[in-house]
Amino acid sequence: MRSEWVARRRGQANVTQMHFARQGVITEEMDYVARRENLPPELIRSEVARGRMIIPANINHTNLEPMCIGIASRCKVNANIGASPSSSGLAEELEKLKLAIKYGADTVMDLSTGGGDLDEIRTAIIQASPVPIGTVPIYQALESVHGNVEKLSAEDILHIIEKQAQQGVDYMTIHAGILIEYLPLVRNRLTGIVSRGGGILARWMLAHHKQNPLYTHFRDIIEIFKKYDVSFSLGDALRPGCLHDASDEAQMAELKTLGQLTRMAWEHDVQVMVEGPGHVPMDQIEFNVRKQMEECDEAPFYVLGPLVTDIAAGYDHISSAIGAALAGWYGAAMLCYVTPKEHLGLPNAEDVRNGLIAYKIAAHAADIARHRPGARDRDDEMSRARYNFDWNRQFELSLDPERAREYHDETLPADIYKTAEFCSMCGPKFCPMQTKMDAEALSELERFLAKQPTA
């Protein structure tokens, strides 16, 4: 779809959506996004120019259907997939991608660390995906030196970043905010550093006693991103991995640096979103969102959960969806899903489904609470279908139509029950929605009440 759009921009030194937006140009991607969001194209352009919205759209991902991430638009959901050395491979990851898109993922991150040729896996995912694809390039950089952190060089990392940009990756998690002087701040944490990318860079800094190479070479990364329109997803390497560590000095120190890096990228018209925690008690979620907006000048906030309790192993998609709904309400622009397997293992296809649906619920609830245009239309349509006992319409309107139909049909599978004025919960005699309050009956009641003596 985008081949012709992109062809007209080739040869320019800076092809980012932010660059065009700041020149007053409404690109085809902005116009497409405006129609998807039911928002004016000029609003999309101004939000992208301001840095409050991004359109992750690598010029080499031509089969992409453009979307946006920002507070002016619907709250988005990301699904993580990716092969590991001990589980999964290309076929399984393509199946997860298909499921993620089916159940509403707005973007997908390929976090593969093994399971085959990483370039082959990533290229296949990009070619098969109509949604933006994100990566964490430090993973492949480490794999390129066979897991030996000490041998990793800045040149190795930059080479991988450029290669992934050429392949069509739309946004990359760059953990440039974890500085060597921040490492002692984790001393009193219960769970230390829980970011994989952060852990890799921390080990590198401890081994070499040198500053984070992603920080010292940040301008080099900017130059790569300008050429392909790759968006920064500034990684929170020092995010809290448990409630005890939430909102601590290490997290806040890194956040301040992420704000500085955001402004540096903006100086070159490169798009940025900022990643956030993690594990946060409910009473600290609003503070975390407000603090990010303050430090990062309202760059879109992309949060992992956050989980609101640490004891829900096997059910962390529920624990985190609670936090995600609150974060979305307070202003987070995208929610990274958590599956039931979080902290326990690599998610399978069913875990992807359960995690995504939990997060689609959270994002939709946030959209309703923020009064986004048309956010509640589907809910009202569902309510009408329920009141009219239109079971097939209820299934269609559900976030997971197959699951809704499956649960209904467990006890009432025959077609005749698709028009029945009851379900198996109340049965035919006790459903309160059978009590229809028609206008004539209510008018008659009002006339009767009007005749009654007042107390």
From Swiss-Prot:
It catalyses: 5-amino-1-(5-phospho-beta-D-ribosyl)imidazole + S-adenosyl-L-methionine = 4-amino-2-methyl-5-(phosphooxymethyl)pyrimidine + CO + 5'-deoxyadenosine + formate + L-methionine + 3 H(+). Its cofactor is [4Fe-4S] cluster. It is an enzyme of class 4 (lyase). Transmembrane segments: none annotated. InterPro entries: ThiC, ThiC/Bza_core_dom, ThiC/BzaA/B. [4Fe-4S] cluster binds at C423, C426, C431. The keyword Zinc applies. GO terms for cellular component: cytosol. The gene is thiC. Substrate binds at N80, M109, Y139, H175, S195, R196, G197, D236, A237, L238, R239, E275, Y302. Catalyzes the synthesis of the hydroxymethylpyrimidine phosphate (HMP-P) moiety of thiamine from aminoimidazole ribotide (AIR) in a radical S-adenosyl-L-methionine (SAM)-dependent reaction. Signal peptide: none annotated. Belongs to the ThiC family. One of its GO terms (biological process) is thiamine diphosphate biosynthetic process. This is Phosphomethylpyrimidine synthase. Its EC number is 4.1.99.17. Binds 1 [4Fe-4S] cluster per subunit. The cluster is coordinated with 3 cysteines and an exchangeable S-adenosyl-L-methionine. It comes from Synechococcus sp. (strain JA-3-3Ab). Keywords: 4Fe-4S, Iron, Iron-sulfur, Lyase, Metal-binding, S-adenosyl-L-methionine, Thiamine biosynthesis, Zinc. Zn(2+) binds at H279, H343.
